[in-house]
């Protein structure tokens, strides 16, 4: 692209210039009128060249005389196409115009000439479009979106030569940064060329697009020769959930947030290679609740929200020199909801900080309705101490960053020592329009009033000139001072113009005598916009001489003497205030002079591995200290080591005669250990004054959370509530004497739980039980057995409360009313009445509004007509939308909203409505080969693989229930049969569970004797497994030998399972606690279960215990008899304990179940009812729940903590090298499809980190197990499933269901405006989860052009004619048929011989089940009335791992008139609603009621 000369087209400029009369004793003022508002105004550094953009026309203008004259930038293709205008932050010659149509322009000579470049990118507000290299101005990243129709994806371009060439860096990145992102990054560290080239990018997770799985990748080769390496943020490990990166001074920061918490972890690097987690003195750092402030060259300053965001206040922290340890400077800083903080460092002067804090912070914490009383404070020692601002004897308070009234800095400029602000004296800050203009010329020590009323202000000529303009309305004049604001003069704007001032600015270094004022004026009905040049250059003032300057100390101590900071005193040569001269050193900034000081305590900081003591006077070890080579051969030995202090890097203090805190000291070797290693398992047993426990739940600390607690809350049978913060070693009763009737853990945030009473008063914790706060509900909880609290998936503090109104007498006027709060109950607002359930619908997968709410409301607000409408709103029901008029229930999941819709008549089948965006619904097409005369019941199963799974009941006779699992396409509307005859119990739960941590693996129990069951026989069960997300199912392969080395009584065929010999496991419906799943989210590939080998599943009392280490392909018997199990430390510890029989011992394995050791944990036999650990299974602590039953037993239920932390084999941290993942304690494991020899699963080869079983170390915090998605595989039959109205045949092919037709394939042409073609049905469709490319295209064989798209079709398929087309079609079909026949004849049972209608048993939940709700929903109109035991942690839904949340078809719950009635109730089960919130269910009376939704 050739360089084009800029055409100065004055005639094209839609502007008019007005100039005031030239006077020698006043400034010359020139006004230029624009028809539209000018934006993006900036100066090129060290020049009078200014640019701006017309916000409406998309034109760009330039002035070469500091704004007196303006010309349009006239380039080919530019007119009207400018989208945004940007200056380079460090190169004074460069600027960029980003265009609307893929064309963009860059100048390298201050807009004299421009170079055009192309990049197909659209710019949204979510990303900064230009990211600059800190040391090479030709290196720039350009990031935005590439869109085709409505489909957009992120794209990042890069250039290394100033956009002479442009290449794509990476697609789908959510933000990129150069490692060297500031001019001083890496100074003094001798960074390698690799780091200079390094780019960090946030990219989606390998298996999930959600932000909780974001990864931070870096590349030193622009992602050309590699796909990037994950940044080792946390002790050498990668971290998931990276949400943003930022650069400040010499630091690069990355913030990460784990799923199910709002707390962030902040990671810092000062060299682009070594990262450290920042510690904030125990302070939580919340998402969108911290602000990185202007920092120094030797520390980072961050303000962290301390309390509720509805009235935000913060705490100011300052880091040590490497950014790892932060100490608090001042609490209760004033913030606003946008994250702006009232904080500013005084320009050019080290150590002076102005902040605003909240005086009445205690009142504000109590109520968000209290208005903040803000006061101003100043620090002269880098934030160590603060003091009030003083105007005479009065305290002065100034408006700051949260009330920006101008561009640039608020108070200061490069003019040494001059500071200004708008505010007032008195007790606290008043409204801006009640303020006056104040000035200080001694850097904030003393202040005086400059002008009455609020003004914008700016400094020029190094402070010799101050200009101010009225800022409370329109004005026709400016004010200026030539003596530091002591005296003021006025000058009128030309031609009688009166404007509302918007911006008052000057060149960035404040060394010139020219200013620019931007404002607007209204004449008649038109708004006119002006850019006004104010020039003092022609005033009759002499040039200052040597005697006109003074040596001015930048900082004074309490004795008014020059003060030391960073080892020196700072001085400036500054013009005296009262002399009559101008400095006239344009573009020459004032240069500070430094005088060194002797070292003092303030010149030192804590050394690596040390933190400040509680009193702040010393530095103490933060962790075990490194041992010098050859030292510490004995525990009591001594060695010379760090004192805990070091001189702050960059500090220039004089060592001789000064303090020497960093001198090495003699240390004892015990400092090198934090906790002595006993080498043994530690046991702690705690008894409670109750016979049993009613429930427990974990408030799990996530990886991004601060602290080391492992918090459990437990409820006894006596309704006492206990909490432990150390996983059961120490317990404390909470709320003694209070009548807590419900405990509601937050559905989406594990740090939060609510404790409710029947009156509506309650408490909540936001920090896993460390603190509890009180709140008051708007009305008492509802009495209709409905969930009381509903939560927002992304906004932690947003609640919906469903309470009871007019219910004192329980008459017909009693009804439910929903209220909402956006500040965790501090304020409540009416939402809707006569509701059954309301729910926030926002999910990250949907583009819906945060305010989108669905409610079920009785039609005409009349609950007697039994018609429930499904309504939605995004404005809190100021307006509403009716989706369905008569529903049974609805369920929300990550990707789908599913609604059970009633027919017009009671005997009609239910219909299924589906939406992916919460706005548009469509009826689902269910497969005809699911032979159900009338569809009465659905169970919505887990749906996280871009497809919804439903269990459709086929037989609903009590104790004989079974049904079919059907699976949807990617938008949830078209379903195919996945598995027939799947067992279901009376409550609607199905024997179906997905394996956690691995894609597409699931197990289900089917009924193997359907024909007999239909005649009234008892169900017999078989276990099936799928490795391709339900497309194909097979029996489980039994072990070749049992745990004692003996053969089983039945035999397999060639090592493969048969109908007569397979492994069968007890499943979901037989569990006392649904959280006891086969698998763990962190123990990849490992599952345990109890069952037997044979033709069918036998009694649970006859079961043995089995394990798989390869995702269910092969199994091994662990021990005879049935055991309860739990995974710890991500599977590096597995603990099993006998189920339903007394024991003194447990067994544990440290090598994934290959070998087991016995451990005695009690002297008295105990009956263990459950074993638990944190839901992520990453802890080395376990809890056994049970009672002593042997001789010498103690009364009461006990919780036994089993701690493996000191076990010598699990005391050292495992080492993971992200660049060489198999170099140390881990290896890469590839899951396999049992029927594909090439190792492909869902069209790719995935590699997972797994600890080597023989390594004696612990994993610790949750590991990012998935290392990479390797080769993309060619498509095979396993990447397809049968299409709608097709069913699998015995040979594995798909054939039409007799008498039915496939969906009309031409519908795609009308449903998708971008579609060019449609394909004839083949009977196959791609599994939504597959990533395969090429190979067998079983779903697309014969294409046809969509109407009016023939031309595009021919371009897409040139030359596809005749014989060529025949072979393209016939070859895949023939090959697929041949392979299908070969596999079928060689492997008996690959397709499981599944007979339509087979079904399986599911036993009942135990009579003492603690369940109140779990994440399964029965959308059914047929389930028998079931009441609930309300004292079960409703948190169960969040940790049950086989099902997604879906509300229940029966949500009736038992009510109780007394604690005794409650305690006596057994065997009752509640409606299954994942946001059902009741734990304690004491109510007003004790009777059963039939549900009003057709329950029988």
From Swiss-Prot:
Record family assignment: Belongs to the VPS10-related sortilin family.
InterPro entries according to UniProt: Sortilin_C, Sortilin_N, VPS10, VPS10-sortilin, WD40/YVTN_repeat-like_dom_sf
TM region positions: 1363-1383, 1410-1430
Chief location category: Golgi
Functional note: Functions as a sorting receptor in the Golgi compartment required for the intracellular sorting and delivery of soluble vacuolar proteins, like carboxypeptidase Y (CPY) and proteinase A. Executes multiple rounds of sorting by cycling between the late Golgi and a prevacuolar endosome-like compartment.
Residues in compartment: Lumenal: 22-1362, 1431-1496
Cytoplasmic side: 1384-1409
Membrane topology: Multi-pass membrane protein
Keywords on record: Glycoprotein, Golgi apparatus, Membrane, Protein transport, Receptor, Repeat, Signal, Transmembrane, Transmembrane helix, Transport
Gene Ontology BP, a term: Golgi to vacuole transport
CDD domains reported for this sequence: Sialidase_non-viral (cd15482)
Keyword Transport: yes
Cross-referenced PANTHER family: SORTILIN RELATED, SORTILIN-RELATED RECEPTOR
Protein name from the UniProt record: Vacuolar protein sorting/targeting protein 10
Sites carrying sugar chains: 190, 297, 322, 971
GO cellular component: cytosol; Golgi apparatus; membrane
Species, as recorded: Paracoccidioides brasiliensis (strain Pb03)
Domain of life of the native organism: Eukaryota
């Amino acid at each position: 692209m050739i360089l084009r000369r800029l055409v100065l087209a004055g005639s094209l400029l839609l502007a008019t210039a007005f100039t005031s009369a030239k006077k020698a004793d006043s400034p010359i003022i020139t006004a230029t009128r624009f028809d539209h508002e000018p934006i993006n105004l900036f100066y090129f550094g060290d020049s009078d060249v200014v640019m701006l953009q017309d916000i409406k026309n998309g034109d760009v203008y330039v002035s070469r005389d500091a704004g007196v004259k303006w010309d349009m930038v006239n380039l080919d293709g530019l007119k009207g196409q400018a989208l945004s205008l940007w200056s380079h932050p460090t190169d004074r010659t460069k600027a960029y115009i980003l265009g609307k149509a893929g064309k963009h322009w860059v100048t390298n000579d201050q807009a004299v000439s421009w170079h055009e470049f192309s990049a197909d990118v659209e710019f949204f507000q979510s990303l900064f479009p230009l990211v600059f290299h800190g040391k090479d101005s030709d290196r720039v990243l350009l990031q935005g979106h590439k869109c085709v129709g409505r489909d957009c994806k992120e794209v990042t371009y890069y250039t290394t030569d100033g956009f002479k060439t442009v290449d794509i860096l990476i697609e789908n990145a959510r933000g990129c940064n150069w490692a060297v992102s500031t001019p001083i990054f890496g100074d003094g560290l001798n960074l390698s060329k690799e780091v200079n080239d390094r780019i960090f990018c946030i990219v989606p997770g390998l298996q999930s697009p959600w932000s909780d799985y974001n990864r931070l990748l870096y590349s030193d080769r622009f992602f050309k020769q590699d796909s990037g390496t994950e940044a080792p943020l946390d002790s050498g490990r990668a971290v998931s959930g990276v949400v943003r990166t930022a650069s400040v001074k010499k630091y690069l920061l990355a913030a990460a947030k784990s799923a199910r918490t709002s707390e962030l972890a902040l990671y810092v690097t000062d060299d682009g290679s070594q990262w450290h987690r920042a510690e904030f003195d125990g302070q939580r750092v919340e998402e969108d609740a911290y602000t990185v402030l202007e920092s120094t060259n030797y520390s980072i300053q961050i303000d962290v929200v301390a309390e509720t965001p509805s009235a935000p206040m913060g705490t100011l922290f300052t880091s040590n020199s490497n950014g790892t340890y932060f100490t608090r400077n001042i609490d209760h800083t004033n913030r606003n909801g946008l994250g702006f903080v009232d904080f500013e460092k005084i320009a050019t002067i080290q150590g002076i900080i102005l902040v605003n804090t909240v005086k009445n912070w205690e009142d504000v914490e109590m109520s968000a309705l209290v208005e903040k009383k803000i006061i101003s404070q100043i620090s002269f020692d880098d934030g160590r101490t603060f003091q009030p601002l003083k105007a005479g004897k009065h305290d002065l308070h100034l408006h700051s960053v949260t009330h920006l009234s101008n561009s640039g800095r608020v108070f200061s400029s490069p003019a040494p020592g001059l500071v200004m602000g708008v505010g007032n004296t008195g007790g606290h800050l008043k409204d801006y329009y009640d303020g006056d203009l104040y000035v200080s010329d001694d850097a904030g020590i003393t202040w005086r009033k400059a002008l009455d009323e609020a003004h914008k202000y700016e400094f020029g000529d190094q402070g010799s000139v101050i200009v101010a303009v009225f800022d409370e309305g329109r004005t026709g004049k400016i004010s200026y001072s030539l003596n530091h604001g002591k005296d003021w003069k006025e000058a009128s704007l030309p031609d009688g113009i009166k404007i509302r001032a918007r911006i008052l600015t000057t060149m960035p270094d404040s060394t010139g005598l020219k200013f620019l004022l931007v404002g607007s004026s209204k004449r008649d009905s038109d708004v006119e916009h002006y850019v006004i040049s104010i020039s003092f250059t022609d005033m009759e003032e002499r040039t200052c001489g040597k005697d006109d300057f003074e040596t001015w100390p930048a900082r004074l101590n309490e004795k008014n003497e020059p003060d030391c900071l960073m080892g020196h005193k700072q001085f400036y040569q500054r013009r005296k205030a009262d002399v009559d001269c101008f400095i006239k050193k344009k573009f020459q900034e004032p240069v500070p002079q430094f005088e060194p000081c002797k070292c003092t305590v303030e010149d030192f900081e804590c050394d690596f591995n040390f933190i400040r003591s509680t009193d702040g006077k010393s530095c103490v070890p933060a962790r075990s200290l490194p041992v010098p080579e050859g030292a510490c051969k004995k525990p009591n030995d001594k060695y010379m080591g760090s004192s805990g202090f070091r001189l702050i890097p960059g500090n220039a203090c004089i060592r001789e005669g000064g303090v020497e805190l960093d001198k090495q000291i003699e240390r004892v070797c015990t400092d090198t250990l934090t906790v002595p290693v006993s080498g043994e398992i530690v046991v702690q047993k705690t008894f409670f004054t109750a016979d049993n426990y009613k429930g427990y739940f974990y408030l799990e600390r996530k990886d991004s959370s601060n602290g080391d607690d492992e918090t459990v809350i437990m409820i006894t049978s006596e309704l006492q509530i206990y909490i432990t913060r150390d996983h059961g070693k120490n317990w404390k009763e909470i709320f003694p004497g209070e009548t807590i009737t419900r405990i509601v853990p937050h559905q989406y945030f594990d740090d939060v739980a609510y404790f409710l009473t029947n009156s509506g008063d309650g408490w909540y914790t936001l920090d896993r039980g460390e603190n509890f706060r009180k709140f008051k509900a708007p009305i008492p909880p509802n009495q209709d057995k409905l969930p009381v609290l509903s939560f927002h998936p992304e906004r932690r503090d947003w609640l919906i409360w469903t309470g009871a109104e007019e219910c004192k007498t329980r008459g017909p006027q009693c009804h439910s009313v929903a209220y909402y709060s956006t500040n965790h109950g501090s304020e409540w607002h009416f939402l809707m009445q006569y509701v059954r359930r309301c729910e926030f619908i926002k999910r990250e997968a949907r583009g819906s509004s945060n305010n989108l709410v669905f409610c079920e409301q009785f039609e005409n607000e009349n609950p007697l007509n039994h018609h429930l409408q499904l309504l939605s709103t995004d404005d809190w029901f100021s307006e509403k939308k009716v989706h369905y008029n008569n529903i049974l229930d609805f369920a929300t999941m990550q990707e789908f909203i599913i609604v059970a819709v009633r027919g017009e008549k009671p005997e009609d089948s239910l219909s299924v409505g589906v939406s992916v965006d919460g706005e548009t619904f469509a009826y689902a097409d269910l497969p005809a080969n699911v032979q159900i005369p009338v569809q009465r019941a659905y169970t919505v199963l887990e749906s996280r693989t871009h497809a919804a799974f439903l269990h459709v009941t086929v037989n609903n006779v009590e104790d004989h229930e079974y049904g079919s699992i059907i699976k949807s396409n990617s938008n949830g509307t078209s379903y195919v049969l996945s598995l027939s005859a799947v067992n279901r119990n009376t409550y609607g739960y199905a024997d179906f569970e997905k394996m956690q941590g691995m894609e597409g693996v699931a197990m289900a129990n089917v009924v193997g004797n359907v024909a007999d069951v239909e005649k009234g026989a008892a169900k017999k069960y078989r276990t099936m497994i799928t490795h391709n997300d339900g497309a194909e199912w097979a029996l489980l392969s039994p072990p070749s030998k049992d745990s004692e080395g003996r053969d089983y009584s039945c035999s397999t065929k060639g090592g493969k399972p048969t109908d007569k010999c397979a492994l069968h496991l007890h499943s979901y419906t037989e569990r006392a606690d649904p959280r006891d799943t086969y698998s763990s989210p962190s123990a990849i590939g490992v599952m345990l279960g109890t069952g037997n080998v044979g033709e069918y599943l036998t009694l649970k009392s006859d079961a043995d215990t089995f394990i798989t280490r390869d995702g269910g392909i092969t199994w091994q018997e662990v021990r005879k008899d049935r055991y309860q199990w739990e995974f710890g430390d991500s599977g590096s510890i597995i603990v099993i304990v006998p189920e339903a029989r007394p024991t003194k011992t447990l067994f544990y394995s440290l090598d994934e179940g290959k070998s087991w050791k016995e451990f005695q944990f009690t002297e008295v036999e105990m009956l263990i009812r459950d074993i638990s650990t944190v839901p992520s299974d990453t802890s080395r602590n376990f809890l056994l729940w049970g009672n002593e039953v042997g001789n010498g037993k103690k009364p009461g239920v006990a919780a036994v903590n089993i701690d493996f932390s000191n076990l010598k084999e699990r005391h050292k941290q495992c080492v993971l090298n992200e660049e060489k993942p198999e170099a140390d304690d881990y290896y890469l494991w590839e899951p396999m499809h049992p029927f594909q020899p090439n190792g492909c699963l869902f069209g790719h080869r995935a590699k997972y980190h797994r600890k080597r079983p023989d390594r004696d170390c612990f994993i610790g915090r949750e590991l990012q197990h998935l290392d990479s998605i390797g080769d993309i595989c060619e498509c095979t039959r396993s990447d397809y499933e049968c299409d709608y109205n097709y069913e699998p045949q015995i040979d594995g092919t798909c054939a039409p269901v007799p008498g039915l037709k496939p969906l009309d394939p031409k519908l795609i042409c009308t449903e998708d405006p971008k579609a060019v073609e449609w394909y004839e049905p083949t009977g196959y469709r791609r599994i939504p989860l597959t990533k395969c490319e090429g190979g067998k295209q079983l779903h697309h064989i014969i294409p046809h052009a969509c109407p009016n798209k023939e031309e595009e079709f021919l371009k897409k398929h040139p030359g596809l004619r005749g014989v060529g087309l025949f072979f393209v079609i016939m070859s895949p079909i023939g090959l697929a048929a041949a392979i299908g026949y070969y596999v079928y004849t060689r492997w008996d049972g690959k397709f499981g011989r599944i007979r339509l209608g087979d079904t399986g048993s599911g036993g009942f939940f135990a009579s003492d089940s603690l369940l109140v709700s779990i994440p399964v929903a029965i959308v059914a109109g047929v389930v028998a009335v079931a009441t609930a035991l309300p004292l079960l942690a409703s948190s169960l839904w969040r940790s049950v791992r086989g099902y997604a949340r879906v509300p229940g078809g029966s949500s009736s719950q038992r009510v109780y008139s007394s604690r005794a009635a409650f305690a006596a109730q057994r065997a009752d089960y509640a409606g299954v609603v994942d946001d059902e919130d009741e734990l304690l269910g004491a109510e007003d009376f004790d009777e059963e009621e039939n549900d009003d939704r057709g329950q029988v």
